[in-house]
């Protein structure tokens, strides 16, 4: 199981195929997505990689986080996340994952925070039908109607669909196809819509319900921090004390 990446949503556009067909795509940008540390079975009880993306000023960081970035020998990151991986898919600490970590044609799962809609009624939030337009209905055309029984059960049950805050939910969209990658600019173009607003952080992983293509690099496509060039072969994971 390979690692995912942390990307930032740029927006939507479209690309044209050789036959003239246009495909709506979402542009995701990798902003110096580097490995910050490893989680091992011996130390933590599970295997994972901690990644960081974006940039952040050191003056705004707590001391504990400063030490974490110092041990990894990377610049402070704005977004930090963990990805579960198999032991043979660990990438060296400090390495920067490239956009061609994903290959054209493969499917990915993307996770983001949906756009906030504020307080919404039952029709917008839950797709309720509302009340009738005439036949005695006044003012309450868009109300949700009754929320419970009369004598039995005599109450409104918990988790009843009602008006309330809508949006700002963690949403995962499955099986989006990778249409194109741009290593020089760090861009990944996926077919379809991705949850979240422009500038929002997105986690991109290999699709769990699709077979990984045979040409997908393992453990991944990355560039070493010491300028050793792009790598695809597995490298031994160095022990990171305190990471």
Swiss-Prot record:
Methylated by PrmB. One of its GO terms (biological process) is translation. It holds the Pfam family Ribosomal_L3. GO terms for cellular component: cytosolic large ribosomal subunit. Coiled coil: none annotated. InterPro entries: Ribosomal_uL3 (IPR000597), Ribosomal_uL3_bac/org-type (IPR019927), Ribosomal_uL3_CS (IPR019926), Transl_B-barrel_sf (IPR009000). Residues 231-243 have a biased composition (Low complexity). The modification N5-methylglutamine is found at residue 151. Keywords: Methylation, Ribonucleoprotein, Ribosomal protein, RNA-binding, rRNA-binding. Part of the 50S ribosomal subunit. Forms a cluster with proteins L14 and L19. Belongs to the universal ribosomal protein uL3 family. One of the primary rRNA binding proteins, it binds directly near the 3'-end of the 23S rRNA, where it nucleates assembly of the 50S subunit. This is Large ribosomal subunit protein uL3. It comes from Rhodopseudomonas palustris (strain BisB18).
């Amino acid at each position: 199981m390979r690692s995912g990446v942390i990307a930032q949503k740029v927006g939507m556009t479209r690309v044209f195929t050789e036959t003239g067909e246009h495909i709506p795509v979402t542009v995701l940008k990798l902003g110096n997505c580097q490995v910050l540390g490893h989680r091992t079975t011996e130390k933590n009880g599970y295997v994972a990689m901690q990644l960081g993306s974006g940039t952040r000023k050191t003056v705004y960081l707590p001391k504990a986080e400063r030490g974490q970035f110092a041990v990894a020998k990377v610049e402070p990151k704005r977004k930090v996340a963990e990805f579960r991986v198999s032991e043979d898919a660990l990438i060296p600490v400090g390495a920067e994952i490239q956009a061609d970590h994903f290959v054209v044609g493969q499917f990915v799962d993307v996770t983001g925070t949906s756009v906030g809609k504020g307080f919404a009624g039952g029709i917008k939030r839950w797709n309720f039908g509302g009340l009738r337009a005439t036949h005695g209905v006044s003012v309450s055309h868009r109300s949700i109607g009754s929320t419970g029984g009369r004598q039995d059960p005599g109450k409104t049950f918990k988790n009843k669909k009602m008006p309330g805050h809508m949006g700002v939910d963690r949403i995962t969209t499955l099986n989006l196809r990778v249409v194109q990658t741009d290593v020089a600019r760090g861009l990944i173009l996926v077919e379809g819509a991705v949850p979240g607003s422009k500038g929002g952080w997105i986690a991109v992983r290999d699709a769990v319900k699709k077979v990984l293509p045979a040409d997908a690099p393992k453990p991944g496509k990355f560039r070493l921090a010491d300028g050793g060039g792009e790598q695809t072969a597995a490298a031994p994971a160095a022990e990171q004390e305190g990471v």
